[in-house]
Amino acid sequence: MTWKIIADSGCDYRQLPTPAINTTFVSVPLTIQVADQVFVDDASLDIDQMMETMYATAEASKSACPSPDDYLRAFEGAKNIFLVTITGTLSGSHNSAQLAKNIYLEDHPDTKIHVIDSLSAGGEVDLLVEKLNDLIDQGLSFEEVVEAITAYQEKTKLLFVLAKVDNLVKNGRLSKLIGTVVGLLNIRMVGKASETGTLELLQKARGSKKSVQAAYDELVKAGYAGGRIVMAQRNNEKCCQQLSERIRETFPQADIKILPTSGLCSFYAEEGGLLMGYEID
């Protein structure tokens, strides 16, 4: 029995460290348009160059989702397929994936495909991909994996910490005044992905130290009790290490991974940003 785990580049993994038996992981890239340049978010992307270009232009940058054809190509070669997308509130990737699924099943009726809207990005998507791999590795049937991953998604959340908000300002999602204040006063925006997949501000913390404590407080308030965490970060390892230490003071057995953000997640998190997925009880 052949399996595929597919994720768009709202997931930070380019490949899985230890794929389950008979399982292939495929990353399907979104593209990021900065002025007249288009950056494809695959393993060859120079994220530093993309970010430099983005900050050098006054125009709003934007992302474009994979086409149904991109997903159709990714489906080939497996009988059991799971596909995880970035939240449908930020991208059309989920709609594109659903369309591709319907087209593919017309010609391949014996294939099983389950598409998951993560309602999130970054670390929480990474957790869902890791869990799918674990469930397949346990030898479960397709239907059992669907049931288990659906239940698991109810127990995962996303917390974000943003040190820069240039993109939000350029795209009109945040006022220029707030953007200026964030930059001048060293403010960090601490927020979460809501139940419907929108980004929701929780706190404003001044400086790195206070943002670490604010992130920890929100984590515990949301129900974290020592489970798995994936910190997807854009040039922010110091903050991640400090937050990891703070978490382990209370939960010494916490399983914490730190990953660099994909191009798309770097686009949203910006420099110094963190998109942290975590499990709750």
From Swiss-Prot:
It comes from the Bacteria. Keywords: Lipid-binding. InterPro entries: DegV, DegV_C, DegV_domain_contain. One of its GO terms (molecular function) is lipid binding. It holds the Pfam family DegV. Residues 3-280 form the DegV domain. Gene3D superfamilies: 3.30.1180.10, degv family protein, Dihydroxyacetone kinase, domain 1. Hexadecanoate binds at S63, S91. PROSITE patterns: DEGV (PS51482). May bind long-chain fatty acids, such as palmitate, and may play a role in lipid transport or fatty acid metabolism. NCBIfam families: DegV. This is DegV domain-containing protein spr0652. It comes from Streptococcus pneumoniae (strain ATCC BAA-255 / R6).
